[in-house]
């Protein structure tokens, strides 16, 4: 059965993070996740996760949206070392990394080589700490105009060149629906490279029911691959938050 994780950045936004964690646990979810770790009360988050006995499925590298940057490798490596310390303290094994936006004054291949170099340096730190980096393609048509990494095959090309078991892909089923669709075929073909999933309904980035994706079929396909990681819910609810998250949970439990 697919294991769902709740991205607490998107839900109960008026509440402290520790209260959000408690509510995720009360609904019966098996894990939670969040984005960046800076400017958060990590002690309170750790206490809340331990009280709820709830694993942290993923968090983002600091600095994020940065793997494309020029002359940034030392900063990225240092940021990954700091992120690894936080992840170890919180018991998190999966680190989300986004790439950043296109440089208009250089060719695709020059950019690609730098992204691979920067990502490989960060992945080496992750590998040394028993962590996995998941590179996330995003959509450029609605949410992230100018973002460089947009398609699954492009991400596969990068992680294959890095050639480390600590280099994987975050397959976001909202972003990929917008950019190329073909969700089930792609996730089935690339599952050995996928280390995490995100979900949201399209259009709108809202609930999983009512959009153009059939998440029951998608979850069945993920399950059929033998994938043992988490599928993160990263959407903006239009319903009451508790009602919305109960609805999402019913897709894997009902």
What would you call each of these model-derived segments?
Residues 1-28, 91-93, 149-171, 175-254:
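Histidine-acidic metal/acid-base catalytic patches
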Residues 66, 70-168, 178:
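Active-site acidic/histidine proton-transfer and metal-coordination neighborhood
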Residues 1-10, 56-67, 99-103, 142:
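N-terminal small/glycine-rich loop or linker at the start of catalytic domains
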Residues 30-39:
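A short beta-strand-loop structural module common to alpha/beta enzyme folds
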Residues 38-50, 105:
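Active-site-adjacent beta->alpha loops and helix N-cap segments on the catalytic face
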Residues 33, 58-60, 96, 134, ...:
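Conserved beta-strand positions in the central sheet of alpha/beta enzyme cores
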Residues 37, 100, 138, 202, ...:
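Flexible loop residues that form catalytic
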């Amino acid at each position: 059965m697919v294991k769902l994780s709740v991205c607490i950045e998107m839900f109960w936004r008026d509440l402290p993070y520790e209260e959000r964690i408690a509510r995720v646990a009360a609904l019966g979810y098996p894990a939670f996740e969040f984005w960046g770790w800076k400017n958060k009360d990590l002690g309170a988050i750790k206490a809340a996760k331990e009280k709820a006995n709830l694993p942290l499925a993923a968090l983002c590298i600091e600095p994020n949206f940065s793997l494309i940057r020029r002359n940034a490798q030392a900063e990225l490596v240092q940021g990954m070392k700091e992120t690894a310390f936080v992840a170890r303290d919180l018991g998190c094994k999966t680190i989300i990394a986004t790439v950043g936006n296109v440089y208009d004054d250089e060719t695709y291949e020059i950019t690609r080589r730098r992204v691979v170099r920067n990502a490989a340096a960060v992945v080496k730190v992750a590998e040394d700490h028993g962590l996995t980096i998941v590179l996330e393609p995003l959509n450029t048509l609605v949410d992230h105009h100018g973002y460089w990494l947009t398609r699954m095959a492009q991400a596969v090309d990068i992680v294959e060149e890095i050639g480390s078991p600590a280099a994987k892909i975050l397959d976001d089923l909202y972003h990929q629906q917008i950019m190329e669709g073909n969700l089930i075929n792609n996730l089935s073909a690339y599952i050995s490279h996928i280390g995490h999933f995100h979900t949201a309904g399209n259009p709108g980035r809202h609930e999983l029911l009512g959009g153009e994706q059939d998440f029951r079929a998608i979850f069945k396909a993920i399950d059929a691959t033998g994938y043992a990681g988490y599928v993160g819910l990263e959407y903006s609810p239009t319903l009451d938050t508790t009602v919305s998250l109960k609805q999402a949970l019913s897709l894997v439990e009902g």
